Amino acid sequence: MATKKNTRKRRVKKNIESGVAHIHSTFNNTLVMITDPQGNAVAWSSAGALGFKGSRKSTPFAAQMASEAAAKAAMEHGMKNVEVAVKGPGSGREAAIRALQATGLEVSAIRDVTPVPHNGSRPPKRRRV
């Protein structure tokens, strides 16, 4: 039985001028994915992927760091301006948008794409602290 050689695909530098930054901010984490206009992923990051654990993942600072990491990776592919699509009720929404602007990406539009149920499934019970 021959051993299979582990060949890893090299990351190709794409030349993409503009794209869409999808910020998914939940109560527990913030995910930032930057795609080309067709929706193909260029770069992504999250608070958990950067080493934040537990309740620290849900902070605005963790969202800011995740946003900066994704923006730097996207700028390596030649990205200059992005549209921002924000989804979810988390605390890191505004911090992530501000971090994208601070890294040098030009934000052309901000859209809120949070899904709103037309009376779908029953929500989780209220917390009693």
Curated annotation (Swiss-Prot):
Source species, domain of life: Bacteria
Record's keyword terms, sorted: Ribonucleoprotein, Ribosomal protein, RNA-binding, rRNA-binding
TM region(s), chain numbering: none
One cellular-component annotation, GO: ribonucleoprotein complex
GO biological processes: translation
InterPro entries linked to this entry: Ribosomal_uS11 (IPR001971), Ribosomal_uS11_bac-type (IPR019981), Ribosomal_uS11_CS (IPR018102), Ribosomal_uS11_sf (IPR036967)
GO MF assignments: rRNA binding; structural constituent of ribosome
SUPFAM superfamilies from the UniProt entry: Translational machinery components
Family indicated by similarity: Belongs to the universal ribosomal protein uS11 family.
Its job: Located on the platform of the 30S subunit, it bridges several disparate RNA helices of the 16S rRNA. Forms part of the Shine-Dalgarno cleft in the 70S ribosome.
Subunit structure as annotated in this protein's UniProt entry: Part of the 30S ribosomal subunit. Interacts with proteins S7 and S18. Binds to IF-3.
Record protein name field: Small ribosomal subunit protein uS11
The species this protein was found in: Pediococcus pentosaceus (strain ATCC 25745 / CCUG 21536 / LMG 10740 / 183-1w)
